[in-house]
Curated annotation (Swiss-Prot):
GO annotations of cellular component type: cytoplasm
Function: Stereospecific condensation of phosphoenolpyruvate (PEP) and D-erythrose-4-phosphate (E4P) giving rise to 3-deoxy-D-arabino-heptulosonate-7-phosphate (DAHP).
GO biological process assignments: amino acid biosynthetic process; aromatic amino acid family biosynthetic process; chorismate biosynthetic process
Known pathway: Metabolic intermediate biosynthesis; chorismate biosynthesis; chorismate from D-erythrose 4-phosphate and phosphoenolpyruvate: step 1/7
SUPFAM superfamilies for the chain: Aldolase
Family matches, as NCBIfam families: aroFGH, PRK09261.1-1, PRK12755.1, PRK12756.1
Family: Belongs to the class-I DAHP synthase family.
Source species: Haemophilus influenzae (strain ATCC 51907 / DSM 11121 / KW20 / Rd)
Listed name of the protein: Phospho-2-dehydro-3-deoxyheptonate aldolase
Length: 362
């Protein structure tokens, strides 16, 4: 009878699984690409700066800027190399963190990011993707540019999170219980986007949930299944990204959301995503959103503490076409503003912060 029961269990298990491949344990990549002293110090300092901005102790603007997604490490390094002097130039007014997104949530199907599909040819060499991602994060941090990423599952943070200075939970996963639990244990600040329908309640609920301790299932650095116990994350905040009914970056929208935040007892301020529904998915409109947000800041508003921008070396986007060479430095997911517009945008944001200081000191 015992043998028969075992056979039944096996026969009914994994009936839709094609195959199962082993993944490298996190420790293998942490030992291969350890964080240098310089990189570790940068991450620690940037997390501290983000904490101070989020908690109203620093009047600078937190700026998360970079490609929609990373598909070409060489272009990512060039972007970081160009961003470094701008981070230094505007350090008194902006805390600039590079957007380094390796995983892409999809509404239906599509390329899921460099970790899942590093070679863009449907081979799904996930172990290689993890290696490439960690090596790239190491190189970017060693350049003196801190990194930001989106967290989509409970396991990849064990491979990469020590290099992340700020994290995001996307609009499609903000309502997810496991992502709220994950955020409660991440060592960096985490932004929750409002829902795709534009609603902000799910994000505010997520912040409250992530502030509390949780238990969840993940893996250890050695790859063993484990129960993770968290302390709670006090550095969570909302990101306004617009919704099905339109943008939500206007002064009126920000005021309304801040009133809701104030009711929760938290500091009433927000991060604004210049892209996605706030730009109606038209990448050039990010510059219009920037101008509106800069006006709010320059007139003295302290309700916007941070912004998010989709930017690349070359503006626009491209499709992956077999046999056709890719345009170097151009997105293969959401369209981005190009480098020249990115430089102008950062100058405008810096000027707005300086103007706010003058407006509030009078």
């Amino acid at each position: 009878m015992a043998k028969e029961k075992i056979e039944i269990v096996v026969a009914n298990d994994d009936t839709r699984i094609e195959k199962v491949d082993q993944v490298l344990p996190p420790i293998a990549l942490l030992e291969k690409y350890p964080a240098s002293e310089q990189a570790a110090a940068l991450v620690k300092q940037t997390r501290h700066e983000a904490h101070n901005i989020i908690h109203g102790k620093d009047d600078r603007l937190l700026v998360v800027i970079g490609p929609c997604s990373i598909h070409d490490p060489k272009a990512a390094i060039e972007y970081a190399t160009r961003l470094k002097p701008l981070r230094e130039k505007y350090k008194d007014s902006l805390e600039i963190i590079m957007r380094v997104y390796f995983e892409k949530p999809r509404t239906t199907v599509g390329w899921k990011g460099l970790i899942n599909e590093p070679y863009l040819n449907d081979t799904y060499r996930l172990n290689d993707g993890l290696r490439i991602a960690r090596k790239l994060l190491s190189d970017i941090n060693d350049l003196g540019v801190p990194a930001a990423g989106e967290f989509l599952d409970m396991i990849t943070p064990q491979y990469l999170a020590d290099f992340m200075s700020w994290g995001a939970i996307g609009a499609r996963t903000t309502e997810s219980q496991v992502h709220r639990e994950l955020a409660s244990g991440l060592s960096c600040a985490v932004g929750f986007k409002n829902a795709t329908n534009g609603g902000v309640k799910v994000a505010l609920d997520a912040i409250g949930a992530a502030e509390a301790p949780h238990y969840f299932l993940s893996v250890t650095k050695f790859g063993h299944s484990a129960i993770v116990s968290t302390k709670g994350n006090e550095d969570c905040h909302i990101i306004l990204r617009g919704g099905d009914k339109g943008p939500n970056y206007s002064a009126e929208d920000v005021e309304k959301v801040c009133a809701d935040i104030e009711k929760t007892g938290r500091i009433p301020h927000v991060m604004v995503d210049f892209s996605h529904a706030n730009s109606s998915k038209q990448y050039k409109k990010q510059m219009d959103v920037c101008q509106d947000v800069c006006n709010q800041i320059a007139f003295g508003s302290k309700q916007i503490f941070g912004v998010m921008v989709e930017s690349h070396l070359v503006e626009g986007r491209q499709d992956l076409v077999d046999g056709k060479a890719q345009t170097y430095g151009q997105s293969i997911t959401d369209a981005c503003i190009g480098w020249e517009d990115s430089e102008r945008l950062l100058q405008q944001l810096s000027d707005a912060v300086i103007a706010r200081r003058k407006a509030t000191s009078n």
